[in-house]
Swiss-Prot record:
Residues 278-310 are annotated as: Leucine repeat II (LRII). This is Scarecrow-like protein 15. Residues 320-410 are annotated as: PFYRE. GO terms for molecular function: DNA-binding transcription factor activity. A motif (VHIID) lies at residues 232-236. Residues 198-266 are annotated as: VHIID. The gene is SCL15. Residues 10-24 have a biased composition (Low complexity).
Amino acid sequence: MKIPASSPQDTTNNNNNTNSTDSNHLSMDEHVMRSMDWDSIMKELELDDDSAPNSLKTGFTTTTTDSTILPLYAVDSNLPGFPDQIQPSDFESSSDVYPGQNQTTGYGFNSLDSVDNGGFDFIEDLIRVVDCVESDELQLAQVVLSRLNQRLRSPAGRPLQRAAFYFKEALGSFLTGSNRNPIRLSSWSEIVQRIRAIKEYSGISPIPLFSHFTANQAILDSLSSQSSSPFVHVVDFEIGFGGQYASLMREITEKSVSGGFLRVTAVVAEECAVETRLVKENLTQFAAEMKIRFQIEFVLMKTFEMLSFKAIRFVEGERTVVLISPAIFRRLSGITDFVNNLRRVSPKVVVFVDSEGWTEIAGSGSFRREFVSALEFYTMVLESLDAAAPPGDLVKKIVEAFVLRPKISAAVETAADRRHTGEMTWREAFCAAGMRPIQLSQFADFQAECLLEKAQVRGFHVAKRQGELVLCWHGRALVATSAWRF
């Protein structure tokens, strides 16, 4: 439901107004890399749970009004600075990298001699497990998986071997039901490790930055009209730790005569209570530094599943932008209903960022096909990671454990749960609902090319495909960003 617009109180005047022509000549360091400064977004977080600020250990309340989460927090200005480098001592055992995992299984990163380097025939056993799951022969799947456990004991070796290990673990979690445990809030240590992993990933690979900058540019392109409302509302279905909004705030501030107003509604999982407090605190502080008016609200995923877009507060006069990724489609029972409900919101633009290979695998209805496609996709991601980081680099292992492994687990669980039900791909659902793709601007191309030039990792290149701007690794799409309009 939309409510009448009320002009938010203007707390400040805009510092500078920079036209789009000048911005095209910004250097790479000024325009692109400056925007993902994790040090300015996240303060240093200690590994010890007891070191967490009291404000982040407090309760977490929900209200019925607008179905939003209102995190309780207080700004702690005494948090020390974020570390620039991960030290090996931070992860002295495999339990640090794989929380809750039994130490006797030998899944630590140090078990390098346990990997079968004689060939890749372990893939055959992996596919046998998939075939057993697809035919509902779950006991036989367990037998084959137990044999596979003896051959793939740690995520070491070549990219395909490491990917096979993560996919084998995901299959094991699905078969045992361990991925269906009751909701558990993330521990302070887990949050710290994830933040560090994301920061380091952004530092060595162009993949995260490509996702953020292309999405932000698609949003900015939709707001470039002279008649645009100064009030921008972004509905984000995968906000993460919110670092991408630093870039967006900078651009809105520079391009808006009035300083701009940004409102974000993030749909988040139930276990992300602590993360939402961090996101709100840091983005609010950053907005104050940028002198931009800013609001952020959170809606529980469970609430959205029940109420759809009625769970979100919309205000008349705002320009609504919806930012989505495959994550939302994994949670919902069907893509078609989501898109039909989205149509009623009448967003200015819908930005879809696919960094999980969904463009090519979703909707097949075949668990085997989706599994093999996902295995190939993440093998390519790991290969690109190897090219960006030196062999044996600890940062690479942390990125795999805290960024890529959860994505693999979620992809396998979704494909397994839907193995008997084919459905439209997201693109088919968009087109069926009357959505049409919008060409991304040349400036988005410019940013992407500059990013690759800065990263200097050979093998990446930028391409265009069916209206998408695509980051490729040796011809295989790793990230595809597209903008759509009803």
